[in-house]
């Protein structure tokens, strides 16, 4: 039996609407995405396999919302919105349901043409749509999963996502077909800090941290500056950004 047939048959036996349900299960096992009580938004959710898994993981205390242009048959405990996520009206409906999301997930894929470069470009476009939606909906420290077909534009997409999250990794779940070029960008820890890695700026050192680094505040955000002393006002380059604090080095 092929891997495709195995997951297809398992989905039928276990009541999942698509074999893709196992992709989300494996992504969650690898990256600890959805926890009890989480609010989850699934983009391009039809027919609902990912919604079923997200609902299991978030539990009764969680909130799960699926968005798609196609109708999604009802799933107990899951809200659905029929619409285009790029339109303001659809986003407003979702925000009214969830406020802020803990996790945004997307298994969206383009209609395949068989032309590799075109299919890749369209998949990157859909992944960017998911990324932009996540920036709008995610709570601080929230997570994103977005599917993309591997190709020449994948690295640029990853770099853009990486700038807005604590870290990004790519995962090819076992449930994906062997012949598929699909991979999933898994971005953890939505950053809301006023600085990003690589930024240069002038700061004022107010005091010293426990490890002896200078401490500066940027719009209330704590930046630790190695080798700086209280009273200094150096120009620095940001070297690492965490949800609640970051690190920088002085420029010569």
UniProtKB/Swiss-Prot annotation:
The entry marks the following residues as binding S-adenosyl-L-methionine, namely 48, 50, 68, 84, 107
Q: Which organism is it from?
A: Natronomonas pharaonis (strain ATCC 35678 / DSM 2160 / CIP 103997 / JCM 8858 / NBRC 14720 / NCIMB 2260 / Gabara) (Halobacterium pharaonis)
Which family does the entry's similarity section mention?
A: Belongs to the class I-like SAM-binding methyltransferase superfamily. RNA methyltransferase RlmE family.
**Enzyme Commission number(s) from the entry:** 2.1.1.166
Q: In which compartments does the protein localize?
A: Cytoplasm
Enzymatic reactions: uridine(2552) in 23S rRNA + S-adenosyl-L-methionine = 2'-O-methyluridine(2552) in 23S rRNA + S-adenosyl-L-homocysteine + H(+)
Q: Which residues form the active site?
A: 147
Put simply, this protein is called Ribosomal RNA large subunit methyltransferase E
Q: Which UniProt keywords apply?
A: Cytoplasm, Methyltransferase, rRNA processing, S-adenosyl-L-methionine, Transferase
Q: What class of enzyme is it?
A: transferase
Per the record, its GO cellular-component terms are:
cytoplasm
